[in-house]
Amino acid sequence: MHCITRGALAYGRGERGWATVGRIICISNQKGGVGKTTTAINLAASLASAERRTLLVDMDPQGNAGSGLGIKQDNITGTIYEALLNDRPIQELLHPTELRYLQVVPATPDLTGAEVELVNQDNREFRLRDALRPLAAEYDYIIIDCPPSLGLLTLNALAAADSVLIPLQCEYYALEGLSQLTHTIDLVKQGLNPDLKMEGILLTMFDSRANIAHQVVEEVRGYFKKQVFEVIVPRNVRLSECPSFGKPIILYDIKSKGCESYLALGRELMKRDTPKSPRRRVA
């Protein structure tokens, strides 16, 4: 626990009390294997280690965000499915984690059926937004882990979010599907959520030995400019190991390169949120 305190101190706590309505950030990329869930877990853990009240909502039927934080299937008392389809208050679905300031709303494979079941629901694209509304003042950050698709579950996340963070692996097919995702974001802004913003693109799985990785970084930074986060997440063995132990990297190996990168991402994100920043109003 002492090492987490030191990690949190590295951020600097700044002014407390100004973030009365937390920001909702969804982590999305319809292409699988880009580090989406890894980013959701470890960004949430990094923010929590800085004593930011953080909620991680798992909208991926694979349920890896919950299991990656040590939530065992046998111990799950409620999932996001129940909030979306059964109108169960989301306050009843919160699960604690090893980090004091981090809670999670888990998912199970039952969520797969929600794509079909939501079709006939009233306000089907706004079910998550309405479920999260009572929690708006309880958290500094709500992180949503989206499924690797652009169906109704992802649309719910985009409609509920203030911004989208897109993980992008530093590999040959990195930009494949990115244009489709940005097009979907534009459509959501036109209809479901006019205030939705691009939080940024996070370059992941960077291998400094591979020329193609450097080329991807150059190409993405050249095209998206300031929309790309400064930090780059490297390929890291410890980062790939920690989910099997049910721990975020900050609890598994705080000295690893993977941990350093996600702590840096948390710092970079929090620098954008100053007391002068306009806060979202609760409708």
From Swiss-Prot:
Keyword annotations: ATP-binding, Chromosome partition, Cytoplasm, DNA-binding, Nucleotide-binding
Reported phenotype of the disruption mutant: Essential, it cannot be deleted.
Residue runs in coiled coils: none
InterPro entries xrefs: AAA_dom, DNA_Partitioning_ATPase, P-loop_NTPase
One cellular-component annotation, GO: cytoplasm
Parts of the chain that traverse the membrane: none
Pfam family membership, one: AAA_31
Subcellular location: Cytoplasm
GO biological process: chromosome segregation
GO molecular function ontology, one term from the record: DNA binding
Function according to Swiss-Prot or TrEMBL: An essential component of the chromosome segregation machinery. The ParABS system segregates newly replicated chromosomes during bacterial cell division. After DNA replication the ParB-parS partition complexes interact with ParA ATPase, promoting the movement of the origin region towards opposite cell poles. Segregation may be driven by rachet-like mechanism where ParB follows a retracting polar gradient of nucleoid-associated ParA.
Family per similarity comment: Belongs to the ParA family.
UniProt subunit comment: Monomeric ParA interacts with PadC; PadC recruits ParA to the bactofilin scaffold. Probably cycles between a monomer and dimer; ATP-binding promotes homodimers which bind DNA, ATP hydrolysis causes dimer and DNA dissociation.
The protein's name: Chromosome partitioning protein ParA
Organism (species): Myxococcus xanthus (strain DK1622)
